[in-house]
Each structure stands twice: as C-alpha cells, then as structure tokens.
Amino acid sequence: MTNNMNNYPLLSLINSPEDLRLLNKDQLPQLCQELRAYLLESVSQTSGHLASGLGTVELTVALHYVYKTPFDQLIWDVGHQAYPHKILTGRREQMSTIRQKDGIHPFPWREESEFDVLSVGHSSTSISAGLGIAVAAERENAGRKTVCVIGDGAITAGMAFEALNHAGALHTDMLVILNDNEMSISENVGALNNHLARIFSGSLYSTLRDGSKKILDKVPPIKNFMKKTEEHMKGVMFSPESTLFEELGFNYIGPVDGHNIDELVAMLTNMRNLKGPQFLHIKTKKGKGYAPAEKDPIGFHGVPKFDPISGELPKNNSKPTYSKIFGDWLCEMAEKDAKIIGITPAMREGSGMVEFSQRFPKQYFDVAIAEQHAVTFATGLAIGGYKPVVAIYSTFLQRAYDQLIHDVAIQNLPVLFAIDRAGIVGADGATHQGAFDISFMRCIPNMIIMTPSDENECRQMLYTGYQCGKPAAVRYPRGNAVGVKLTPLEMLPIGKSRLIRKGQKIAILNFGTLLPSALELSEKLNATVVDMRFVKPIDIEMINVLAQTHDYLVTLEENAIQGGAGSAVAEVLNSSGKSTALLQLGLPDYFIPQATQQEALADLGLDTKGIEEKILNFIAKQGNL
C-alpha cells in the first residue's frame, strides 16, 4: 500500500521535524488537514488505532514545531495517539507496515526512532518516566526540555498522580499536557478562555508571579492569602481541575482548544520558557475530522481494514470470541445471582462486558485504568459477601501483582479472575502478549489456575471458579472460539484432568487452546493426549501414571516456559523420582514481537508443524522411538 503523495503537497515535504520547522505558521493549518487525511487513508488500508490519532493532529504539529525534537524530549503515554508523531518523524513511508510482522511498532518504540524517547504500551507511565528524564536533563544543564502527553483516561491511574505529586515537590522544569478528549469542546473553551490562558502562560505573568513569591516568602500570612487568591482566580477563569493541579505544585493553564493550531503554537511557545512544573489542559475531539469516528470514537479506536468513504467497519460473522463467551456467561450468572459483580479496569468493550453493563448496571463497575484498585476493590466486595469477577487482560494483571498476593490470596478470598488475551495476542506486540500469567500466579498459595481448551471448557471453568470459594483464575486467548457445542454448566472436579486420546510411548499434556494441534499430531505419532485443565492444583496422579506408562512426556502451553505449566510437571516428576524424558513447549525467554497470532505461533514452532518437528527432534536426541 502506498499513498499518492500528490494529494499531500505539504506533507510530502516533511521527512523530519526540522522540515516542519521550516514552514511558515500560516501553512500549519493546511499541513494539519493533509496529515489527518493521510492518517485516515493509511489506517483504513492497514488496520490500527485511528480515532486517538485523528484527535492529536494539531497538538503533534504544534509540539514538533515549537520544541527542538529530538533534543527536546517528547513522551507519549500509551501511544495510541502517536500515529501523527510517527508520520512526522521520518516514518511516513513505513506506515503501511504498522502492527505487522517486521513492520513499525504500533506504539512509540526506542529501538525504532530517536524521536521515541520512551517505549510504551501500558498506560500512565509517561509522567513518571518524564520526571526522571527531566531531572537527568536538569543535571546536564544543556537546556533540554521535557514534555509528557497523557490522555484523560490514563491520568486517572494512581501512578500518574504519584508522579504529579513528586514532580510538584521537586519543582523540576517539565510540561505535562493533558489531552482531554472525553467530550466535545465545552463552552468555556473559546476566545476569552484562550486569551486568558495566553496571559497566564506568558513571560510577564510568570515574571511577576515568581518575583512576588520571592518577596512574599518573607511574609507568610500575605503569601498564603495571595496563593489562595491566585488559585481562586484560576478556578473561576479556567476550570475546577486547576485547583487540583495547582495544589500538586503545577502551574495550570487551560482548558484550551486542542484543535486551534495557532493558539497551540502561541501557548507552547510561551510555556517552553517557563520554569518549574507546568500543566497544559487541552480539549480535543477523538476522531476529529472524520464524521464516523467522531460519532463512534470507541468503535473507531482500533479498526480493521475498512472503506473510509462509507465509514462502515466490516462485520465479523465468524464464531464468537472468547470475550463474548465470557460476557454471555456473566450475564447468565447475573440473571440468577444478584451478588455476582463484574469489574473491569476500563476495558468494557474489549472484555465483552457491554451487554452485562447495560443489563445489570448495579452489578457492574468500571474502575478506570486502575488495576491495583480493581483487585483490592474486589477484595472488599468478597469480604462483604459478594462474588466479584475481575475481567482483565493478562498483560494488565501484571500491574496488580501485589494486590493479587497481599489482598486476595493471603486472605483466601473468593475472587474470580477472568484473564483475557492470555498467550499470543498478535499485532500489539511485546507490551501486550499474555506470556507470564501462569508463571507469576503459579507460585501463589491458595490460587486455582485453569486453562480451557475451547469455549465450553471456558464456561465450565468460569462456573467452577465462581463456585469454588477460593481465589481462582481462568485464562483464555484473544480471538474466536473453536465452535464446539455448549453444555449445561457444572462444577469441574478441582485439579483433575481429562484423557482425550490414548496412545503409546508419547504423551502430550495440553494446557489451553493448542489442543487441536495436539490432537492432529496424536494421529501421526500415536500419542496419548491429556487435556490437563488445571495448572494449579495440578493433576499429580495423572502425571505419575503417564510417566510410568510412556517414554516421553510433552507439555504444551501459550505461556513462558520458565515457571509455566511445563515447569509444574517437571516439579512433579522430580518430587516423585521419575526420570521420564520431558519436553516443555511454550514461549521462549524473550519478548515476543508483533505479528499475527498465526505468524507468531509458526515463528515460535508452536503451530502443528513446529510442534511435530520439536517432538521428533527431542526423541531423536533421546534415542530411537
């Protein structure tokens, strides 16, 4: 895919921010228009994150126009909004490869460009990292500026406020920009508000403010009175948020129109020269400039390939996803039990909870991007006699590890974790792979860990976790289910596996949705196949029987080999004194890069062909079959 650059006369001249800074200010509106159109054309042909980037076009242009990037350091939080940044920093021609194998990364990535200061993927890290970068720059004394751009969702996380609190105390020179795209431009974002913001960000006001503070430091009562007067003025003229950020030690400016390129350039030019921590609050519209995305910013957050003229996204008529299987199960339970509570850390759509949130609003909690809080909130509900279900992506559960141990497991509370996107997730790459959850949960006492091989098993395991009265986790992958028949719900025997096929010499112990590959291979190799179901407690009796009756055991999982389910089998064999040869197949000891799920599994040797080759090579090394 290549865009016709004849349609983008100004953008075609921009191969770096240095080129951008050669333009006249009056050319910037046209550049923004071309950049927005180019982004739409590119993403519609490749898939990717669209609505967020459409909303940050003017901000991106203004930042690279005013700041001397990469000398000045620009940090994007998460990175969904950073596509325009990639286009302006020398990667325009590579946008056709974004989120693809060997292509450019979906998020800012240090190894990809000197303009990507921080590699990101998870939210709310920008201010903490930015503060560290700003402190380092301050010690270099080279005049380097630091800017962090964070969204209104990401700033709700505790980590962001921890960083704001620290930055305000240190008084380090840095600028935090809040990209607030929750609502359309509000009434107080207009000419008067922009004028006031320019006054408060200007050098005269800053000089008077700093000079007055030095004088009034010697007269505390007057100093306190003037401080409160300034905060009151800002609260009246700007927004209630100003008082909060001023109390944290920041000079707050805003909210201002994030789509007015002239005002943004003027504002940032003023703020670049201010000392101490600065906070600029801009209002933007997610999906700006493309009507379908403005109307449905959630639907156009991440999109497949689509027709930009009609704006219609392709419908998925295939088998239901595991996320939908979970959502349907949760609704089914809520119909019978008013005490079941669904909790999500800002992933309602992705986790399949839209219908549940609409049908059972009193049993639904979206706690925002606050994974730690989500888990301990569930702890409190469990103590109160309710049955909390935390729906969370595997990669995000990492952020609540202490709460999982300290608040849930130690107290042995009945909290069910529905762990979505376990294993290979595909195009979002290393930051989003669900590679570690088995490993980091398996060592926690009191945990029950289940690995369904299909959607019916997934439902039964969710029901088992809901009924068991202990901390329990069910991990399932991104994507469509297998298509098996759903059976009535019943509680599975805890810690027991199921024998699928009986063979000779080779036994494949499957954990999760790679079972179809195991079954296909079993016909070729005349292998026994056991669906282990439980990683913890693991079926020790079955493992010992298989070790006694087979020459080779093979474990199969979409989790890191180190500390994973295969390691649990190895521990059983060791403690039982069994010397049966064991091959552990799973994810290797490196971060898995972006690719489709199928490409990644093939590259890792975890597709059917790769598994067969690994088994045969292992047997060859051990001796003849």
Swiss-Prot record:
* A GO-annotated cellular component: cytosol
Q: Which SUPFAM superfamilies match?
A: Thiamin diphosphate-binding fold (THDP-binding), TK C-terminal domain-like
**Entry's InterPro entries?**
Dxylulose-5-P_synthase, THDP-binding, Transketo_C/PFOR_II, Transketolase-like_Pyr-bd, Transketolase_BS, Transketolase_C, Transketolase_CS
Task: Cite the EC number.
Answer: 2.2.1.7
User: Which metal ions or organic cofactors does this protein require, according to UniProt?
Assistant: Mg(2+); thiamine diphosphate
Under the heading CDD domains, the entry gives: TPP_DXS, TPP_PYR_DXS_TK_like
- PANTHER family in the cross-refs: 1-D-DEOXYXYLULOSE 5-PHOSPHATE SYNTHASE-RELATED, 1-DEOXY-D-XYLULOSE-5-PHOSPHATE SYNTHASE, CHLOROPLASTIC
Q: Which NCBIfam families match?
A: dxs, PRK05444.2-2
Its job: Catalyzes the acyloin condensation reaction between C atoms 2 and 3 of pyruvate and glyceraldehyde 3-phosphate to yield 1-deoxy-D-xylulose-5-phosphate (DXP).
What name goes with this protein? 1-deoxy-D-xylulose-5-phosphate synthase
